[in-house]
Amino acid sequence: MTECARCGICCEKGGPSFHTEDRMLIEKGKIPSKFLYTIRKGELAHDNVKGCLKPVDSDIIKIKGKEDSWTCLFFDEIRKGCAIYKGRPQECRVLKCWDTRELEQCYANARLTRKDLVSGVKGLWDLIEDHQARCDYNKIQPLIKDLTGVKRNRARQKLLEIIRYDAEIRNLVISRGGLDADMLDFLFGRPLTETLGNYGIKIQQEGTKIRLDRR
């Protein structure tokens, strides 16, 4: 094989990650931010090149999937085509499933971050930085480890505080800031109630009550 067969398998495995070369696609609105989500620094994520789950070194901004699947939001499953083909990101342009060398070379280089895109928005960027500091995965991982040790009660309390703050800041920017709810996963990453499953944590929420258990 030396050309794309339009099978759509690469699109069904998840949308691309963005690099600095893609910045204008977002800033000019060709790919609106509400269709994106952020894998935050330190978060466990699947490395598509190495084929394993590992903490990421920096923000990774990606296109959301369709509903509960990883299929890229812009993939037309009936026509087996891309809705943004002419303005597709760098990773989509260099990907050749029969020869992944070019993708492997650019995969971890010059990744686009939230700071690149929204650090100039006063107030909002302060909230993002505060959220990143208080919900840092480098703080969360030791607490998860301590859940099975002598420090488990303190660890559980601290972890619940972080999870509650993560939920509260999202509600706050919607109710008081009038922010579009679809922007939350881009600005603050995915909710901890979703991502902590990768760390073996099961979270159950009933109203304002949150319960967490080890799987």
Spell out what each predicted region is.
Residues 1-215:
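Hydrophobic scaffolds flanking metal-cofactor catalytic centers in soluble metalloenzymes
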